[in-house]
Amino acid sequence: FYNGVDSTGDPQRLANARQAWFEAMPVKRDTDDRTYRSIRWGNLTEMLLLDTRQYRDPEVPANATFAGLLDAQDTTAPPGEQMFAPGRTTLGEAQLQWLKESLATTRAKWKIIGSSYDMAPWKLVDFDTPELRAENPDLQKNGGIYVSNEAWDDYQDERRKLMRHIESENVSN
C-alpha cells in the first residue's frame, strides 16, 4: 500500500498485498485482517501502530512545482483545496475510533502513535499569515504550498480532529 495505492485500488491486488504483508511480517493475524495494532511494554509504554494506507482516500495530486525542484500542492487551486475537505480519511472510521478509544483507556505512562506519515506539516509557503489574513479574512485556514508527498497534510480535517481529541481528553505523553 504505497506509491499511490489506496482504498480505491483493485480489490484482488489489495487482498494479495495484505496477504503478503501478513506472510512477511512477524505479527499475529486477527480475525479482521487489520494491520493496525498496539504493542505494550508493561505499564510504561503502549505503542499504537497505525495503518495509514489500507483505508485511505486517494492522495491529492500535485498541482504546482516549487522552485522548479519539488512537486507541490497549492491549496488555492484545484485539486489542492481537497486537502481540507471534511471527511477525507487516511485511517478510516473504525481505525480512528480504535485509536481514540486506545488513547483514552490505556493506563500506560507513555503513549506512542506510530504512523508511516509525518504528522507535522510540510508547508513550503504559508498563505495563512496574520498580514494576509488582515487583508482577506476569508483565507483558507492553514492554506499554503505543501510538499507533495504521502503525509497527513492530505488529510488535514482528520489530523485536526485527532489533535483536538488528544487535547480535549488530556492525553498526556
Located regions from the model:
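Long, structured stretches of catalytic cores involved in phosphate-ester chemistry, encompassing
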Residues: 1-173
